[in-house]
């Protein structure tokens, strides 16, 4: 039996959910059109008579590849299953894949390529908050759509991102409330690595511990 860490499991299921949501999003958008694509020049468009182009942007190389490879595999599996079921209103989903290379500026660069040069309908991608924050200005400038496939620290909202995972208050605060109620905990030790998710999550947790639970 193969075992997955909680983050990897959430990432895989979140990626799968994101791809399935995209199917609904694109099909709804397509049904809203009052004209067939045959009536327009579809060269370079995200949706043509035969295909719907989407981008997949994860780290396939570098230190983050060990986590992100599973996400892109789940997304490609979901798209394969959608295509085998007839696609989106008879259109096959065409994948354009890019490698973020575990480098945050590269995520921004590849996001711009997918939106500006490849004209994808949406991008499934990023993993760390650093990669998402690097790519976010590009999606907002180009009015693109990013499906972010895993949980994150919160404190960020954008009309150009669908956050498919929980944010920190939906995870950590529930756990703290349980420990306080069931175990009577008063003193807490917050331990995490030095990057965006732990730093922000610990700030949220500390405020909840002190202001709501009366602990320290």
Per-range role (PLM):
Residues 50-68, 126, 187-191:
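Short beta-strand segments enriched in small/hydrophobic residues
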């Amino acid at each position: 039996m193969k075992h997955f860490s909680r983050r990897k499991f959430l990432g895989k299921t979140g990626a799968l959910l994101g791809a399935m949501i995209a199917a609904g999003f694109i099909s709804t958008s397509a049904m809203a059109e009052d004209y067939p694509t045959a009536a327009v020049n579809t060269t370079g468009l995200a949706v043509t008579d035969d295909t719907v182009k989407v981008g997949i942007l994860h780290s396939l190389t570098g230190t983050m590849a060990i986590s992100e490879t599973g996400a892109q595999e789940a997304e490609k599996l979901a798209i394969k299953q959608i295509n085998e079921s007839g696609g989106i209103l008879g259109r096959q989903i065409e994948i354009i894949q890019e490698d973020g290379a575990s480098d945050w500026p590269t995520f921004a660069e590849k996001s711009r390529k997918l939106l500006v040069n490849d004209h994808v309908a949406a991008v499934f991608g990023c993993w760390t908050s650093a990669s998402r924050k690097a790519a976010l200005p590009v999606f907002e400038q180009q009015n693109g759509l990013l499906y972010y496939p895993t949980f994150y620290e919160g404190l960020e909202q954008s009309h150009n991102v669908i956050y498919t995972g929980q944010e920190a208050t939906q995870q950590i605060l529930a756990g703290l409330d349980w420990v306080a109620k069931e175990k009577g905990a008063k003193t807490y030790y917050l331990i995490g690595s030095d990057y965006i998710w732990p730093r922000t999550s610990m700030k949220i947790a500390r405020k909840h511990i002190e202001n709501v639970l009366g602990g320290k």
